[in-house]
Amino acid sequence: MKIEDKLVTSVISGLKALYGQDVPAAQVQLQKTKKEFEGHLTLVVFPFLKMSKKGPEQTAQEIGEYLKANEPAVAAFNVIKGFLNLTVASATWIELLNEIHADAQYGIVSADENAPLVMIEYSSPNTNKPLHLGHVRNNLLGNALANIVMANGNKVVKTNIVNDRGIHICKSMLAWQKYGKGETPESSGKKGDHLVGDYYVAFDKHYKAEVAELMEKGMSKEEAEAASPLMNEAREMLVKWEAGDPEVRALWQMMNNWVYTGFDETYRKMGVGFDKIYYESNTYLEGKEKVMEGLEKGFFFKKEDGSVWADLTAEGLDHKLLLRGDGTSVYMTQDIGTAKLRFADYPIDKMIYVVGNEQNYHFQVLSILLDKLGFEWGKSLVHFSYGMVELPEGKMKSREGTVVDADDLMAEMIATAKETSQELGKLDGLTQEEADDIARIVGLGALKYFILKVDARKNMTFNPKESIDFNGNTGPFIQYTYARIRSVLRKAAEAGIVIPEVLPANIELSEKEEGLIQMVADFAAVVRQAGEDYSPSGIANYVYDLVKEYNQFYHDFSILREENEDVKLFRIALSANIAKVVRLGMGLLGIEVPDRM
């Protein structure tokens, strides 16, 4: 039983005994005692002054005396201006640690058969280039969010919508056709997504050269762009694709498959995956159908040029284009089509879209449209909106080939982690295979943690050098502390020490030890809160605070060399449960922790 619940029950009994009044539990406010005061939990007594008919200090004193006499969990109390600070007894903290120790998945709630089904969409790549740093933030947030939502007792379906059609895809295809000379991933030794990305860059280079040439001949920039033979060929290719031209479709299929093989490798290395992948080429026609259905029902209207619009002025928005005059779709149409397919595939209770904050308006509109079209979860659609990520050098552009690829970034992080770990002697005594694995775990952990510790809504700068630091609020610092605890536990096991189910309760704990148990116990509430707020950063920063406190404890107290056997057992058990919570917390973020370092 939570200590807070135990104390609330006793406070209710005390108010009845002292003042003859029944008080609902919701009226009893307990909060953590401020650091500058003595105690663990503080009771706010102001709501009880009417029934006590006394001043705040006297009321607090009377309730404190009652609790000290009748509730074994209260060892002492003090009163500061109507706030009753309660010190929890050591035996109660030890009892709480026993409960946490008995639960291997402490803080994690499993879904039962009646649990709500939450679908989370993330990644959403284009098939004309590799995944880049922006996708890294998206994938890491989406994956962590899925884990956190699942840890709160929900069923989760992780889904991806691949943007596999459109003019941008045709640009890569046309460039390969013109300049590729039959090059393949096998013949070039390149990953398929990188090879296709090279041709996207090549298209842009040739297109810019054409435009410059036409401008030299006296055309304006707009005229030159409209007259570019290369761009017109790309547009023709798109028309052929839409018409199902067998040659264009075969080329599209071949190049997309190269990209998917490359994506799979990147996702695997990053440690993210999906339960279901949707492709825009399958969903955009469904969207058109649904829009036409909405038009028939009078939800939408048609303009003279044949384009279909939604009038959202009643919702405080404007008119939104859903189908162009020539019948071609826009992004909104595709999202409606994807929603239709998903709703047919799964009984979705909630839909979360992990998409950058530049799309805030888009999802505001989508929510209204889905609701109009009869999707039950339309109104409660969640846009998990996150900020942009940059490197210290500045922004990224993929058309010009100056983008930071996810593969290159991960490889660089792993190489830097290896170098740094070797310099600090963290890999001493390990085999080559073990050292490589540690470098992978530390490098990717540094990347993931640095991105996930930041509030998702904020823009951020990812600093690779800063992220691989074994001190401070970083992944490697947390991983090293975990490995340090595992080393303590191994030595304890080698000495034949076994943690009992029930620890001796006859020891006096230090303030630091009580504080650590309180922090470990908080993990369950932190997971709940992260689920309510959709906040991976809440978990990340909690884990950092916990290991920072543990490191101080490790420095100031003997563990294995402690002479009192009961105290030694307690400290080993405390260390084991801190390691467990660190592993579970980092696991929710998709970060591995090494057993040794």
From Swiss-Prot:
Gene Ontology molecular function terms on file: arginine-tRNA ligase activity; ATP binding
Classification via InterPro entries: aa-tRNA-synth_I_CS, Arg-tRNA-ligase, Arg-tRNA-synth_N, Arg-tRNA-synth_N_sf, ArgRS_core, DALR_anticod-bd, Rossmann-like_a/b/a_fold, tRNAsynth_Ia_anticodon-bd
Subunit structure: Monomer.
A Gene Ontology term for the protein's cellular component: cytoplasm
Keyword presence, Nucleotidyltransferase: no
Keywords associated with the record: Aminoacyl-tRNA synthetase, ATP-binding, Cytoplasm, Ligase, Nucleotide-binding, Protein biosynthesis
Subcellular location: Cytoplasm
Source species of the chain: Bacteroides fragilis (strain YCH46)
Enzyme class name: ligase
Domain of life: Bacteria
EC numbers for this chain: 6.1.1.19
Coiled coil start-end: none
Motif ('HIGH' region): 125-135
PANTHER family cross-referenced by the UniProt entry: ARGININE--TRNA LIGASE, CYTOPLASMIC, ARGINYL-TRNA SYNTHETASE
Protein family per UniProt: Belongs to the class-I aminoacyl-tRNA synthetase family.
Catalytic activity: tRNA(Arg) + L-arginine + ATP = L-arginyl-tRNA(Arg) + AMP + diphosphate
Chief location bin: cytoplasm
Entry protein name: Arginine--tRNA ligase
